[in-house]
From Swiss-Prot:
It comes from Rattus norvegicus. Probable receptor for SEMA4A involved in the regulation of T-cell function. The interaction with SEMA4A enhances T-cell activation. This is T-cell immunoglobulin and mucin domain-containing protein 2. Residues 297-349 are cytoplasmic. SUPFAM superfamilies: Immunoglobulin. One of its GO terms (molecular function) is ferritin receptor activity. Residues 128-271 are annotated as: Disordered. Residues 136-215 have a biased composition (Low complexity).
Length: 349
């Protein structure tokens, strides 16, 4: 009878339960139940919780293990067994759930002679917002600010305060220029002169050239000529005045008034040909100096060598001369002996 009950209880443990589903909001706790029968309390019943289905994983991704009395392995503090383990209550409590906790879970109890397992499917949803989302208020078309193109870019040049930009110099003639020449005629001579007036209307144009200018002032006077033709000199007084980097042109409406004209400075033009000729002349001078040095050095060396040759040739010539004298004396003696050996030479001749 007892064996029959054990057999029936084993069959009941082998029957798998239906897969239950649980849904929880993120941040809350959830409990997955797992309770097995403790008919035989004398033997230990190890249990485990893991991720995945029981038939395929068998607690390979273990979360927690027990030996039937206490927890022997715990993957994280979020996984708790709050039931009475010795009474067969190994329900799993997951605290502070997150979205990644979603998925299948498996509980296995290793009962002697049989296995008990149960599968669960957990779904963790994201936390719902407490207030509805606010939609942005569309007040019309978006306003796009485009940069205003005012034409060419404005370049600010630094103002040089060292030199004045405008200088006005009024031309003032204090006394009229009058030249009188005495004449020896009976008739009266009348000389009419007109003084130089200061210009009433002055137009001043200013500019900033890089070089100083030369201002020539022409002052002309008219003289009325009478029969005796007394001439009045027309004086031209050029004035060379340095300017402060300004061209001043003064004109007047009166033709008899003084006219001051500004002669624009002529820019110095660089002549590249002149520099080329100067360079060629300098190069030719260097070559000539080098050739002279070589010639002088060679002449001194040759002169030194020729002096040593003369010094060697002098004793040689003396030795040769002495040898020639010895040979001549020997020849003379031979001739004398020949004459003595032939006493009949004079008679036969």
């Amino acid at each position: 009878m007892v064996q029959l009950q054990v057999f029936i209880s084993g069959l009941l443990l082998l029957l798998p339960g239906a897969v239950a589903s649980y849904t929880v909001v993120q941040g809350h706790s959830v409990t997955l139940p797992c309770i097995y029968s403790t008919t035989y309390r004398d033997e230990m019943v190890p249990t485990c919780w893991g991720r995945g289905e029981c038939r395929s994983s068998y607690c390979t991704r273990s979360l927690i293990w027990t030996n039937g009395y206490k927890v022997t392995y715990q993957r994280s503090n979020r996984y708790q067994l709050k039931g009475n383990i010795s009474e067969g209550n190994v329900s799993l409590t997951i605290e502070n759930t997150v979205v990644s906790d979603s998925g299948p879970y498996c509980c296995i109890a290793e009962i002697p002679g049989a296995f008990y397992f149960v599968d669960y499917l957990l779904e963790v949803k994201a936390e719902l917002p407490t207030s509805p989302p606010t939609r942005p208020t569309n007040t019309g078309r978006p306003t796009t600010t485009r940069p205003t193109n005012t034409g060419r870019p404005t370049t600010t040049r630094p103002t040089n305060t060292g030199r004045p930009t405008t200088t006005e110099r009024p031309t003032t003639t204090g006394r009229p220029t009058t030249t009188e020449r005495p004449t020896t005629t009976g008739r009266p001579t009348t000389i009419s002169t007109r003084s130089t007036h200061v210009p009433t209307s002055t137009r001043v144009s200013t500019s900033t050239p890089p070089t100083p200018e030369q201002t020539q002032t022409h002052r002309s006077e008219a003289t009325t000529y009478y029969p005796d033709q007394t001439t009045a000199e027309v004086t031209e007084a050029p004035s060379h005045t340095p300017t402060d980097w300004n061209n001043t042109a003064t004109s007047s409406d009166d033709s008899w008034n003084s006219d001051t004209e500004a002669i624009p400075p002529q820019k110095l033009q660089r002549n590249p040909t002149k520099g080329f000729y100067v360079g060629m002349s300098f190069a030719a001078l260097l070559l000539l100096l080098l050739a002279s040095t070589v010639a002088i050095t060679r002449y001194m060396v040759m002169r030194k060598n020729s002096g040593s040759l003369r010094f060697v040739a002098f004793p040689v010539s003396k030795i040769g001369a002495s040898q020639n004298k010895v040979v001549e004396q020997a020849r003379i003696e031979d001739e004398v002996y020949i004459i003595e050996d032939s006493p009949y030479f004079e008679e036969e001749s």
